[in-house]
Amino acid sequence: MTESITRDSMQYDVVIVGAGPSGLSAAIKLKQLAEKNGREISVCVVEKGSEAGAHSLAGAVIDPIALNELIPDWKEKGAPLTRAVTQDKVLFLTEKKAFNLPVTPNFDNHGNYIASLGEVVRWLAEQAENMGVEIYPGFAAAEVLYHEDGSVKGIATGNMGVGKDGEPTDSFQPGMELWAQQTLFAEGCRGSLSKQIIERFQLDQNSQPQTYGLGIKEIWEVSSEKHQPGLVIHSAGWPLDSKTYGGAFVYHFDDNKVAVGFVVGLDYQNPYLSPFEEFQRFKTHPEIRKTFEGGRRIAYGARSLIEGGLQSLPKLSFKGGVLIGDAAGFLNMPRIKGIHTAMKSAMLAAEAVFPLLENLEEVEGFDSGKEAADYQQRFEQSWLYQELYAARNVRPSFKWGVYLGSLYTGIDQMIFRGKAPWTLKHHGKDNEQLKKAAACKPIDYRKPDGVLTFDRLSSVFLANLAHEENQPDHLVLKNPQTMIDVNYKEYASPETRYCPAGVYEIVEENGSPRMQINAANCVHCKTCDIKDPTQNITWICPEGASGPNYGGM
């Protein structure tokens, strides 16, 4: 159908895919550089969510170092970072007890702020628009466009009003081609176009395999007596076993609200493990449940995290564009922070891209994209590189298990201060770590009580999902039968457990199992694209404005 459609086009100096912290920081920095150099440049940001911040999900405890550089007067301009961290606690949990651990430098949040990433992103969008950046929410970047020489020309937004059969409906609107001298991919973790770019330009050929986590988060309203504004708690241990990397957080922010979340490394081995159920179980711990008893859950969401760090970063630039933020993988996993690193990567990219921008009024056009090759050098000379270098050995050490990994981390961070004369390797791709079901023990999860613990469907309701049912599937199976022949028969259908939204379901049809995909439940976490054992599932963007609206998450 695409071949027969005529799409309109628009020309910009820079097109940015994704209105998250990195995309908006890049847009703001580019406009600042243009003003400083007395130039006018056009910058366009496309965002698949219904508004800037709709798909933004993080803890979030924010280190303001990058924001201080980008917008020094952010306090005067009303940035929604108002709840400073007042106390840090680190716990190791057993089934019944909690042990206080020393607060290591990675968990020292003095000077940081507990905030809603969605609110911060909306504020950044306002700052960008005030500088003349054009932001188009509700438009999913569906295709990368290329010049004849293979360099990136821009992107095309997805068609709207296409039916489930792939044919135009009465409300059909073709996508728009957005051409640019430079295209910045800021899609976040496991971005669908970023994934294509990395593969096409072989940007990861000198990198170690990327590794990921799944983060699941709820927001609760609790009583004033239980609310401790500014308190930040991180925990390790129970309910996960000693072979599985993960942990939890509890953040007390404003208005009697508490954010609680759980992260599981997607290199886990047991196909019977359910990150969602482990999260619900975590809340039943005596030390944790006392905060939430009598409270009310008001929001829910989930998102994959990119955990590989420095040694898993791909090459950052290619002809016609760059990767920024979590699309590349700048998360500092030991600190459980990626917002300030995403913003800094974007600022460095903007500084590398800006000198390449020609005045299009003085040239007839362009038929090739230039490469911002010094983006890599700028990164390596920045505090961002130093921070990721110091953190590089923590995540891969957990391939030895939680106890040895924790011991190594203590030595690496407290004695070597992240400057050990070696760099550890990751142990392979996450989907390859899953063991066959026959070699693993099923895990018995209790039924939720609907008060402290919940099921997936009631949780997804709180993610404020929007999804047009009559549209093509955005969860594409290379071979549908593989979901039965391999996933069901050999791995006991792990997607029915790792998906935090109940998208994947085994149903009986004529006495035989069939995979049913409930695409309308999808919260865009991308876990299936990462963890499927044969990489049979590909996540692509659904129609623009689909998915969650996280609001104050």
Describe the predicted segments one by one.
Residues 14-44:
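N-terminal Rossmann-like FAD-binding beta1-loop-alpha1 element of flavoenzymes
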Residues 19-20, 48, 117:
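Glycine-rich Rossmann-fold phosphate-binding loop(s) that bind the pyrophosphate
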Residues 40, 44, 48-95:
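N-terminal FAD cofactor-binding segment of flavoenzymes
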Residues 71-87, 138, 204-212, 368:
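A short alpha-helix-loop-beta-strand transition element characteristic
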Residues 127-288, 348, 352:
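Predominantly flavin-linked oxidoreductase catalytic cores and closely associated redox partners
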Residues 302-333, 460-470, 482-498, 505:
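FAD-binding beta-loop-beta segment adjacent to the flavin cofactor pocket
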Residues 329-335, 351-401, 516-518, 548:
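Active-site-proximal substrate-binding core of FAD-dependent oxidoreductases
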Residues 489-520, 527-549:
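Iron-sulfur cluster-binding cysteine motifs and their immediate structural context
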